[in-house]
């Protein structure tokens, strides 16, 4: 992928594109971050294969274009390309296991999206008092089982990145929800940012967005 121009296309938010962006950042890969407004989306949609975002457009040195679709498939591809899916079969399994656990948590967050405010507040209360704590406990157990300081060992993997992306969604729902609880999750973020100065800078510089 050396010399290729990589463009990540999504709306002006973290959402499903953030794990892709963070994977590229952590790997030290330059990319163009194209953010589309909801107003412009109807006219841009026909130009995107499948008409869905996020999408990644890769243009090689000869002008040949390759489109990549489906957020987790893209993130996994980029992570594998840059040796961020574990170094052994056991580590690969643990990366995928944690990704699955995090996706369960993301599913709960998605229940709150595109809802009227009153309904959103009701759903938020239900999930924060229901499945979310259970899923966070499961994730904490996986973090405790790690053989290193990060999600799987001591090297940054996709599991680390999808985890902090979704934890940010939990705090979007309630900024105080994690305060004083889930020490493994707080320690994981601290260790991750210490392990990847590029990622730490990216997160420090990242503009606030509603999702």
From Swiss-Prot:
InterPro entries: Glutathione-S-Trfase_C-like (IPR010987), Glutathione-S-Trfase_C_sf (IPR036282), Glutathione_S-Trfase_N (IPR004045), GST_C (IPR004046), GST_superfamily (IPR050213), Thioredoxin-like_sf (IPR036249)
Enzymatic class: transferase
Superkingdom classification of source: Eukaryota
Record flagged with keyword Transferase: yes
Keyword presence, Transferase: yes
Coiled coil feature spans: none
Domain GST C-terminal, residue spans: 88-211
Any one GO biological process: glutathione metabolic process
One GO molecular-function entry: glutathione transferase activity
Binding positions (glutathione): 10, 16, 41, 45, 53, 70-71, 104
Catalytic activity line of the entry: RX + glutathione = an S-substituted glutathione + a halide anion + H(+)
Described function: Conjugation of reduced glutathione to a wide number of exogenous and endogenous hydrophobic electrophiles. GST isoenzymes appear to play a central role in the parasite detoxification system. Other functions are also suspected including a role in increasing the solubility of haematin in the parasite gut.
Family under the similarity heading: Belongs to the GST superfamily. Mu family.
Complex and partners: Homodimer.
Protein name according to UniProt: Glutathione S-transferase class-mu 28 kDa isozyme
């Amino acid at each position: 992928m050396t010399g290729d121009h990589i463009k990540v296309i999504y709306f002006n938010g973290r959402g499903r594109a953030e794990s892709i962006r963070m994977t590229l950042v952590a790997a030290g890969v330059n990319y163009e971050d194209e953010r589309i407004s909801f107003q412009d989306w109807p006219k841009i949609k026909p130009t995107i294969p499948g008409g869905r975002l996020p999408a990644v457009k890769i243009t090689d040195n000869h002008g040949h274009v390759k489109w990549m679709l489906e957020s987790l498939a893209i993130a996994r591809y980029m992570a594998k390309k840059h040796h961020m899916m574990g170094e052994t079969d056991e580590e690969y399994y643990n990366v995928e296991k944690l990704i699955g656990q995090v996706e369960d948590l993301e599913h709960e967050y998605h229940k709150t999206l595109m809802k009227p405010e009153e309904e959103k507040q009701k759903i938020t209360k239900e999930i924060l008092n229901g499945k979310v704590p259970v899923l966070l406990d499961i994730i904490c157990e996986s973090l405790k089982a790690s053989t290193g300081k990060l999600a799987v060992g001591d090297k940054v993997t996709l599991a680390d990145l999808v985890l902090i992306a979704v934890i940010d969604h939990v705090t979007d729902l309630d900024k105080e929800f994690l305060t004083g609880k889930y020490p493994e999750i707080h320690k994981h973020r601290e260790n991750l940012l210490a392990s990847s100065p590029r990622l730490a800078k990216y997160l420090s510089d990242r503009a606030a967005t509603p999702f």
